């Protein structure tokens, strides 16, 4: 049910944990054809706030429906909420820099929304804010927890992740995943190559040029936390791990990426080679959604969406605690049917 890579072990996950969801936006998601993490490029800026609202409340306030792809595939926040319903951990939403603010309680890192990485993603002032405040958040969480799980929501985040990995010296071109079964590699490459021109030499300044607020928020929280960490995400979390490694070479021994089988088995990306380069362990949930009663859920098995909002890590946490595949899929279907019935989902 859970595959282990590079020395990852599931036993470390059998303790109380807090779920941290770091949200933000990047104007890269407005580039047509780059992401399907929203029904239109403009709506992608609503996705992180709506994801956070749905995980906490079971409904969205910022928009009148949960985020869907242009073809109606539901957000992975649905999988996350279903998995966490069996565990009920503390859930904390952290705003690293979202264009649309969620209508729920959240911690603000005093960052800013990411701009177009082909010009300049973030100001150094805001980069410093995000890093300093997220490190402090991680330190505070250490007072209560030995384990945290960090998820992310930022449309076009795989593109900024690829730029981040390349800026930090990793062989990442064309190796990141996509929410679409048709990974727009050529467009990503073009955007990233333009972003990487005339990079400064300083690491933090490089990140300000080509990264995004969420990667910095995830990395900072991890750097400040004293216990074990499950980075719940796909190729984006390899970029977060690369940032962590850039500033603390000893930290990755306490960190594991928790993702989905759809990420590690993605033929159009190579998440495992990225993890190996960075030096981070990986766990993958083998959750099988082919038995779902709903086509929108079964679409995950065809390469749609794949990961996000901590879906893989949350499934791992549920499976480790004895929840069966069938039980988890039934819960996902139940939540999905509630959304369809409440008109909180347009399909």
UniProtKB/Swiss-Prot annotation:
Q: Per its record, what are the GO molecular function terms?
A: nicotinate-nucleotide-dimethylbenzimidazole phosphoribosyltransferase activity
Disulphide bond pairs: none
Q: Gene3D superfamilies given for it?
A: 3.40.50.10210
UniProt xrefs under InterPro entries: Nict_dMeBzImd_PRibTrfase, Nict_dMeBzImd_PRibTrfase_arc, Nict_dMeBzImd_PRibTrfase_sf
| Spans through the membrane | none
**SUPFAM superfamilies according to UniProt:** Nicotinate mononucleotide:5,6-dimethylbenzimidazole phosphoribosyltransferase (CobT)
Q: Which domain of life is it from?
A: Archaea
User: PANTHER family, per this entry?
Assistant: PTHR38811, UPF0284 PROTEIN SLL1500
Q: Which family does it belong to?
A: Belongs to the UPF0284 family.
Q: What is this protein called?
A: UPF0284 protein YN1551_0030
């Amino acid at each position: 049910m859970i595959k282990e890579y590079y020395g990852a072990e599931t036993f470390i996950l059998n303790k109380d944990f807090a779920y941290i969801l770091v949200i933000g936006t990047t104007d890269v998601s407005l580039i047509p054809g780059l992401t399907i993490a929203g029904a239109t490029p403009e709506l992608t800026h609503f996705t992180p706030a709506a994801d956070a609202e749905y995980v906490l409340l079971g409904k969205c306030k910022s928009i009148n429906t949960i985020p869907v792809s242009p073809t109606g595939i539901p957000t992975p926040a649905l999988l996350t909420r279903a998995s966490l319903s069996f565990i009920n951990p503390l859930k904390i939403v952290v705003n690293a820099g979202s264009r649309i603010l969620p209508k729920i309680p959240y911690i603000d890192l005093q960052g800013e929304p990411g701009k177009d990485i082909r010009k300049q993603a973030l100001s150094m002032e805001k980069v410093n804010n995000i890093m300093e405040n997220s490190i402090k958040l991680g330190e505070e969480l250490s007072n209560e927890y030995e384990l945290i799980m960090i998820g992310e929501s930022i449309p076009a985040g795989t593109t900024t992740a690829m730029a981040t990995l390349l800026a930090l010296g990793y062989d990442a071109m064309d190796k990141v995943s996509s929410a679409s079964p048709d990974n727009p590699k050529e467009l990503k490459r073009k955007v990233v190559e333009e972003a990487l021109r005339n990079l400064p030499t300083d690491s933090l300044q490089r990140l300000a040029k080509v990264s995004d607020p969420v990667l910095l928020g995830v990395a900072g929280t991890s750097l400040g936390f004293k216990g074990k960490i499950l980075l719940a995400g796909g190729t984006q979390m390899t970029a977060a791990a690369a940032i962590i490694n850039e500033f603390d070479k000893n930290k990755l021994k306490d960190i594991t990426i928790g993702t989905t089988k759809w990420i590690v088995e993605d033929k159009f990306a190579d998440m495992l080679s990225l993890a190996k380069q960075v030096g981070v362990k990986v766990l993958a949930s083998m959750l099988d959604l082919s038995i779902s009663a709903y086509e929108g859920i079964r679409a995950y098995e065809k390469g749609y969406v794949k990961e996000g909002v901590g879906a893989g890590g949350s499934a791992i946490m549920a499976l480790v605690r004895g929840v069966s595949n069938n039980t988890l899929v039934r819960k996902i279907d139940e939540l999905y049917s509630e959304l369809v019935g409440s008109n909180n989902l347009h399909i």
